[in-house]
Amino acid sequence: MVRKLNKTYAPSTRNGTIKGQVKSARGKNLIYGKHRCGKGRNARGIITARHRGGGHKRLYRKIDFRRNKKNIYGRIITIEYDPNRNAHICLIHYRNGEKGYILHPRGTIIGDTIVSGTEVSIKIGNALPLTEMPLGTAIHNLEITRGKGGQLARAAGAVAKLIAKEGKSATLKLPSGEVRLISKNCSATVGQVGNVGVNQKSLGRAGAQRWLGKRPVVRGVVMNPVDHPHGGGEGRAPIGRKKPTTPWGYPALGRKTRKGNKYSDKFILRHRRKQQRI
């Protein structure tokens, strides 16, 4: 996606970037109102997820993660911005008159055709089961359970790789580096998710972060002892503990949080912490 630098009219725009995108009229039957309640709070109003709150109002775009319109060709009409995710989305017009949103595959442009099914070509944007894909195919929007819809590799720039097929399972390397088994009957979309350079975007000012619903991040060492275990002391003081902790006193920075007896451990061949090139 093309990115442009702002002119230096003001400090807030001096370091910001603008991303080129296609704007279009939104389909009324694909967009819903979204009530954002909580802002990082639980049912008692206590903060459980820090640094969240505020932000501009959003409308939810209904995304088709299932891709269950089999053998019905569709054409990409627009490439749009979605405030609910960092990837762009495409508005698809199908031959049967229906419309739908999908994640924008990298490399596709307005006017391209896509289709989903069991006997479709290996083309960017097409969705088909893993049994019909050759080894080494780059995929995204990957299902974990057949028919449930894509749940893996959906972020901007995400891509998984099909590296083996044996028996009823297929071996895939996920964007995190994890290698795991998934049923060959699960479906995925060919290609990589678009908007690859989103992590290199410069917002230019703090207010742009607040528009996204992100609040300031304050170090615990500069707080008071009542606010954080690292706080207090005279001047610039160390944390005063052997190991760093969370604001609630739990171990942080290196403590494993995954359950040791999780049922899906048997499907993981190589954990993401032990990344090796394949």
Swiss-Prot record:
Any one GO molecular function term: transferase activity
Disordered: annotated segments: 224-256
SUPFAM superfamilies for this protein: Nucleic acid-binding proteins (SSF50249), Translation proteins SH3-like domain (SSF50104)
InterPro entries named in the record: NA-bd_OB-fold (IPR012340), Rib_uL2_dom2 (IPR014722), Ribosomal_uL2 (IPR002171), Ribosomal_uL2_bac/org-type (IPR005880), Ribosomal_uL2_C (IPR022669), Ribosomal_uL2_CS (IPR022671), Ribosomal_uL2_dom3 (IPR014726), Ribosomal_uL2_RNA-bd_dom (IPR022666)
Gene3D superfamilies reported for this sequence: 2.30.30.30, Nucleic acid-binding proteins (2.40.50.140), Ribosomal protein L2, domain 3 (4.10.950.10)
GO terms under cellular component: mitochondrial large ribosomal subunit; plastid
Pfam families: Ribosomal_L2, Ribosomal_L2_C
Source organism, top-level taxon: Eukaryota
Protein name listed in UniProt: Large ribosomal subunit protein uL2c
Encoding gene (name): rpl2
